[in-house]
Amino acid sequence: MDWDDILARSASTGAAPDLIFREEVQKAVLACLSLQEFFSQAVLQGGTALRLFYGNPRFSEDLDFVRKEPGQPATLTAHTAQIGPFLERQFSFIDKAEAVIQKQTATLERISVRLRGTDPSANLRLNLELAAVPSRSNAPKILRYPPINPAVRVESPSEILADKVTALLFRPYLKGRDVWDLHYLLEEHKLTIDWIMVAQKAEDYGHQTADLDMRMGSASRRLAAEGPSALAQEMPRFLTPATLQQYAAVFPAMAAATARRITKFQQGRERGLGL
């Protein structure tokens, strides 16, 4: 792929060249890892999974992985040396690509992929993280990245929803991307929140679960109060102008609808319905 291909896709979709390029790098890294059988041990999660495999219109930033099974050994940093040369072969306009280990502990591995190109927009940093927690629901899927079209093991939408709810309950701040993804999964995919999986996720990440009901109430109120501004502040970075134009006016309604779903979930739990 050359830079003209990036510019042509940008012109046809309305997305900024740097967004198009980042997504192509994400695909290339996933292909590289798949060829090294990384997905026999690990699972893609988060916003990139929603974007590439479940039709979410928002672009994503980094690549996040978890282990395929509880207690199963998995390593991301072992593949560091292969990523840079693979990317240089995929993109003709890249002068240098390298992957650098930033963190390697028993609970988290992080790699920073750095690219430098002839065009300033081709200078990019992409973070990869592998958390030592298990996936609860996943399957292999084919990534559209010809001619390789690699198999990538991906969390199910229900598990991604559980991840997003867990983040909503325990993160000390609200991400606009999470509000968008929650609305997308709850309203567009019509999913229901799996309470058992949320509790499992909370425990996996070392959180106390005794106060989940209280946290759900707080999260619902925060969504309603802060969700519209979080969406307005963050989503212009991750949507095409045409998509943003359609959704910007309904950001308050999106946040309110998502807050109502969280409240309904909490009330159902209090009545023992296990929604």
Predicted regions and their residues:
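Glycine-rich beta-strand-to-loop/alpha-helix junction loops that act as flexible
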Residues: 45-48
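Structured mid-to-C-terminal alpha-helical surface segments
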Residues: 1-42, 53-56, 68-275
